C-alpha cells in the first residue's frame, strides 16, 4: 500500500499502534513488529495526539502513569503525528512540540509537523535530533537559545529559512557529530548573526546552500562545515577568523 493511502486509512480508523522501527497498524490489522511499545487509542483524525496522563475523558488518551522520554520520542517519530499535548513533572508541550522543564530545551518536534515553527521564549537549547526528519519549512529561535545539539535539523528536506535570533554565539560549536543542517536540500540562503563566534564541523554539510553571509567577529569554522555544498559557488571569509 502506498504511504499516502496508508495515512488516509489511519486517519479514517482513528487509532494506531506505536511500535518499534516505526511500524504501525490500524485497528483492523495486526502489527508486523515483534516488540510492541504501546497500544493506545490516539486520536489522529487531525494527526493530533493528546497524551496527557492525567486526563481520563474527552479526546485525550488515558495512560497508567507518566511516559518516559524514550516512549515520548517513539510516539513523535511516528510520521503521521503532527501535534502532541503532554505534561508531567519533567516534560511539557507548547504548540504541539515537546520540551523539557529544567533546563528548558526542545526535546522533539513531531516528524509530521509542517510549516513555520517558533521556538518558545526561555528555551535554552535544541536537543540532539530534535527536528530531524521533520517537514517544517522555517524555524525562528528566541534570543534565549545558546546551544544547538548534533543533528538537530538533519534531513529536514523542506526547511528553507532559519532565524537564529540574537542570543546564540556558536552554531554547532563543541558538538561531537555536528551535522546540524546536513541534508537540508531547500536551505539555499543563510545569514549568520553578528554575535556568532563559531560554526561547528559538518554544520551545513551536504545541504542546499547557495549563499551564506558570515559576520565580522566570527572566529572559527569547523572542518567540512560547508562540505559537499555543491551549489555554494562563493564564500567571503571575515578577517576575524582565527587561522
Label each region the model flagged.
Residues 2-99, 104, 108-125, 133-147, ...:
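Structural signature of tandem-repeat unit edges
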Amino acid at each position: 500500500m502506498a504511504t499516502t493511502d496508508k495515512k488516509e486509512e489511519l486517519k479514517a480508523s482513528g487509532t494506531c499502534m506505536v511500535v518499534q522501527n516505526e511500524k504501525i497498524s490500524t485497528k483492523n490489522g495486526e502489527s508486523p513488529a515483534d516488540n510492541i511499545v504501546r497500544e493506545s487509542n490516539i486520536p489522529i483524525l487531525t494527526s493530533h495526539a493528546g497524551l496527557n496522563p492525567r486526563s481520563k475523558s474527552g479526546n485525550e488518551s488515558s495512560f497508567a502513569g507518566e511516559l518516559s522520554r524514550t516512549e515520548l520520542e517513539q510516539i513523535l517519530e511516528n510520521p503521521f503525528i503532527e501535534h502532541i499535548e503532554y505534561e508531567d513533572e519533567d516534560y511539557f508541550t507548547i504548540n504541539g512540540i515537546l520540551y523539557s522543564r529544567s533546563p528548558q530545551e526542545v526535546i522533539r518536534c513531531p516528524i509530521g509537523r509542517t510549516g513555520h515553527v517558533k521556538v518558545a521564549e526561555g528555551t535554552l537549547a535544541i536537543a540532539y535530533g530534535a527536528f530531524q526528519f521533520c517537514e517544517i519549512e522555517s524555524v525562528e529561535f528566541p534570543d534565549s537559545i545558546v546551544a544547538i545539539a548534533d543533528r538537530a535539523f538533519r534531513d529536514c528536506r523542506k526547511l528553507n529559512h532559519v532565524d537564529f535570533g540574537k542570543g546564540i554565539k556558536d552554531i554547532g560549536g563543541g558538538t561531537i557529530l555536528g551535522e546540524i543542517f546536513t541534508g537540508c536540500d531547500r536551505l539555499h540562503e543563510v545569514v549568520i548573526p553578528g554575535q556568532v563566534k563559531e560554526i561547528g564541523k559538518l554544520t551545513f554539510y551536504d545541504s542546499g546552500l547557495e549563499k551564506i553571509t558570515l559576520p565580522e567577529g566570527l572566529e572559527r569554522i569547523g572542518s567540512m562545515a560547508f562540505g559537499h555544498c555543491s551549489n555554494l559557488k562563493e564564500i567571503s571569509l571575515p578577517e576575524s577568523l582565527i587561522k
